[in-house]
From Swiss-Prot:
Its EC number is 6.1.1.12. SUPFAM superfamilies: Class II aaRS and biotin synthetases, GAD domain-like, Nucleic acid-binding proteins. This is Aspartate--tRNA ligase. It is found in: Cytoplasm. It catalyses: tRNA(Asp) + L-aspartate + ATP = L-aspartyl-tRNA(Asp) + AMP + diphosphate. It comes from Xanthomonas campestris pv. campestris (strain ATCC 33913 / DSM 3586 / NCPPB 528 / LMG 568 / P 25). PANTHER family: ASPARTATE--TRNA LIGASE, MITOCHONDRIAL, ASPARTYL/LYSYL-TRNA SYNTHETASE. PROSITE patterns: AA_TRNA_LIGASE_II (PS50862). Belongs to the class-II aminoacyl-tRNA synthetase family. Type 1 subfamily. Homodimer. One of its GO terms (biological process) is aspartyl-tRNA aminoacylation.
Amino acid sequence: MRTHFCGLVDETLIGQTVTLAGWTDVARNLGGVCFIDLRDHEGIVQVTVEPAEGDANSAEVFKVAASLGYEDVLQVEGVVRARHAVNDKIRTGKVEVIATRITILNKAAPLPFHAHENPGEDTRLKYRYLDLRRPEMQRMQRTRIKLVQALRRHLDARDFQDIETPILTKATPEGARDFLVPARMHPGEFYALPQSPQLFKQILMVAGFDRYYQIARCFRDEALRADRQLEFTQLDMEFAFVRERDVQDFVEDMIRAIFKEVVDVELAAQFPRMTWAEAMRRYGSDKPDLRIALELVDVAELVKTSEFPVFAAAANDADGRVAALRIPGGATLSRKQIDDYAAHAAKYGAKGLAYSKLSETGEVSSPIAKFFGEEAFAALLAHVGAANGDIVFFGAGSYNKVSDFMGALRLKAGKDFGLVAAGWAPLWVTDFPMFEWDEEAQRYVALHHPFTAPAVDDIADLRANARTAVSRGYDMVLNGNEIGGGSIRIHRPDMQSAVFELLGIGAEEARAKFGFLLDALNYGAPPHGGIAFGIDRIAALMAGTESIRDVIPFPKTTGAQDLMTDAPSPIAAEQLAEVHVQVRPKQA
């Protein structure tokens, strides 16, 4: 139906006859001449219709051109010629196609929005097929496609084996809720959609496949936000006979090569490394954005004897923290703006936010200064590095809570004050805690997942020091986004059973849920480790968008709906009966 793509018609084709196909981007009837911007996936070319006196064919072509509306689908035949008025804004701006025939392949109904408009997100998702025609959306989807293609080429060339793992599998606790699928042939029993291929890829290592990868679809029934979806795509990888640095060095080289190939970005020749403890202490986050130079400063030692009870209590608590954040030039903040910062911190658990301003002349303005002697407060500000014109925020409370809300303030201040440097800041975060204590459940939970190996090999040591145990987990972070997470796995059945026990998973429960894994580890499992990268998140970073929905062809809303297909939707009683499911009426 076509000999060339619209966006690739150029000066080398001048004088030649071409056949094009695409959508009517714009049609302009100027009376004696019609101009059509014809668009396909490669871009736009101008089609010109000039009726010649006494020429029945050109008159018919003009009549067709004059009838066109937005997004009509056309086939155009014509001769390429140089444009009198060059359009430098498009790739084909030096040429035009003089139409000798126009065939309307399909008429478009009146549009809810035009390809060059940017309506509300619900409208975009309802008419996703129209939204995806927009050049910006085409660009972002192509970025994702190029990313996946480049990853496959890179791994295939290095002897990784692309192996599929089951989509219908066993429900296992991996953090979020499972999506459950009723098993028609086994009444009352259910499959689960995989949250990740974690256990299968470990078993593939036991099976001797050495290097595995998969572009895997994963499913988690969790609350949605800009960087989360119910179903998502990850690059899943696993290596046999490796230590942490073996995995990290390989994938660091891979990510560096992929960014260069896909978006022509040169990442650092060596990614910095930082322990989890250092990241939390300096940045209040386990995924710090190193483009922002601001850092948290611990001040507990300086406030232990202060008369401000909030500070003194946290400073004298072994699990407490008092931290300060200096914002250069922040003394310009109004009281309302400071209240906005306090409200932002409250979203992350802050019960209050203290501050101190230093005017350009060095005058201190702070509601907490009265709890300190003049010299003591001056020493506190000096320890933080405060200078004239700055504001210093203080947070006090439990260590993790203070780290969370002060880290959130750091990000907000960095953006508000234009302190986010241009470029890319990758790093590795390592040495995560093995466990964290769940106050509500009154038990330990795994910080990564229960198959992550501890840094110690001795089970008695792990049991005795579970509270402070460090894992062999690692995350790759880019511009404040966790783009990949992995670990060295537990390959000994006795260690895996011990970790289950520390997590409150008894032997009987472990056998019921993970018996197949424990059995596999008993038959000569090699030391192994791996990592998984979020394809959606990396594609969004490459495409320059804050929402992964922009790089997913058919995403769900934050309300977990597909507005285009109207999913989820009720199921007929007959279908429910076939899978032995009965739906309880909603409670009034």
